[in-house]
Amino acid sequence: VYFFFIKKHKWYSIKVPVIALGGLLLMTLLKQLFNRPRPLIPLLEPVKGLSFPSGHAMMSVTFYGLLILLVWEYITNRFWKWLLTSLLVILILLIGFSRIYLRLHYFSDVMAGFAAGIIWLSLCVWIIGRMERFSKKEIDPAMAKDTDVV
């Protein structure tokens, strides 16, 4: 809503929900596909659901990774750009490794969640970026390079 109404960025108003909802769907499909049970003895309380890949790890990479991309696109101050990126990467790692510490996931679950999140985010950004360049080229050919779209 912010990107569509306030910033007038149609493509970011599409990117955020597509990446988030698609990530949730992909995570659910992967969990059903692998059907791996959680560790037997959690540190606190037992949690229902499947273990592989870690949904928290995958969605933290997806969401905070998208924020990192926004930071690099919109923040010009080099100090703030690196500080925010570093803090978001640390947050992603803490979320992932907290799942192992709490014995809710195995190490491989978290690593697979990180990998799935990186792959999903990269794929979405690439596809939506190509769609954005293609739509700009159709509206105003001067806005997009001929080499941007195959």
Language-model features and meaning:
Residues V1-L50, L66-E73, W82-L84:
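Hydrophobic alpha-helical bundle signature of multipass membrane enzymes
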Residues L40-V150:
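Membrane-embedded catalytic cores of phosphoryl/pyrophosphoryl-handling enzymes
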